[in-house]
């Protein structure tokens, strides 16, 4: 697997939170989702990868050879969007355009305004409206328009789907695919989310985080095939309890989550066994991690 980013032993320590040590690879040419609950360390990891904050320990390699993000044109090749936006609230869409035009040689102003129009933000009469007067969703749209208007090889987007309505999230998914297809295997997206349901159809590779640690990762199909969902009667669940990682019991039907290697044993016991989708997998794996740390 060709990797656009490789992190080894990455640690970032704060007073009340520690990220890592994290070892991960971001596959080149795909859309990777960094998934975890609020406070899992997703933003800290992305900020550390992008050089917004310096790591306490560890190393990140970019594009197969670069270990210093400040080296050469590395930052020109990476587009970054922060979860809460990255521009002063006193700025206008016009200011955002001018800043990117001055800061990045690969920024296309005409493309920026086209995307603003496509995203329903910063119309002709709103080009000088301050970000302070915009809704949270419109500020995110503006940031996305700016980052997609640049010539980049890697996009790092922190919670890009947050505060967006369903229609705009659908457009964002389309923009993801368009970006990757234009790159013909040379462009990559890394984005974080705490709710994968809305972005599952554009997720090729997933990394799950819990309490500052990576707990699972892989291409989505392979990842889902490592586990199974189980359903059956309460009496049956009493017999298979030791094979389950997580279980839910109610008055009649019970549900559980197990490793795929337990499939034959679970089916022999009379349960219904299915492969989870990504959303189901994330919920149960995060519950299992929480259970292990309680």
Indicate where each model-derived feature is located.
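The feature captures the beta-strand-to-loop junction immediately N-terminal to the Walker
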Residues: 35-37
């Amino acid at each position: 697997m060709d990797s656009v980013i490789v992190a080894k032993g990455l640690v970032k320590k704060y007073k009340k939170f520690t990220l890592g040590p994290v070892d991960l690879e971001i596959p080149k040419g795909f859309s990777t989702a960094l998934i975890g609950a609020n406070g899992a360390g997703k933003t800290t990891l992305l900020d550390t990868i992008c050089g917004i904050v310096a790591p306490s320990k560890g190393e990140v390699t970019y594009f197969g050879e670069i270990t210093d993000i400040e080296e050469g044109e590395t930052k020109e090749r990476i587009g970054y969007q922060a979860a809460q936006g990255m521009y002063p609230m006193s700025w206008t869409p016009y200011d955002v355009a001018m800043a990117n035009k001055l800061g990045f040689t690969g920024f296309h102003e005409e493309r920026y305004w086209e995307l603003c129009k496509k995203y329903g933000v910063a119309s002709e009469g709103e080009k000088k409206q301050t970000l302070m007067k915009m809704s949270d969703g419109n500020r995110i749209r503006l940031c996305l328009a700016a980052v997609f208007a640049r010539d980049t090889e890697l996009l790092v987007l922190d919670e890009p789907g947050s505060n967006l309505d369903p229609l705009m999230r659908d457009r964002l998914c389309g923009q993801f695919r368009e970006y990757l297809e234009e790159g013909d295997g040379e462009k990559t997206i890394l984005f974080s989310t705490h709710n994968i349901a809305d972005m599952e159809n554009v997720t090729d590779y997933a990394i799950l985080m819990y309490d500052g640690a990576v707990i699972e990762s892989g291409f989505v199909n392979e990842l889902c095939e490592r586990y199974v969902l189980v359903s059956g009667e309460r009496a049956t669940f009493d017999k298979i309890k030791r094979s389950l990682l997580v279980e839910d019991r109610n008055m009649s039907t019970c549900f559980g989550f197990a490793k795929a290697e337990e499939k034959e044993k679970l089916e022999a016991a009379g349960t219904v066994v299915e492969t989870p989708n990504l959303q189901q997998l994330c919920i149960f794996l995060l519950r299992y991690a929480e259970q292990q740390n309680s």
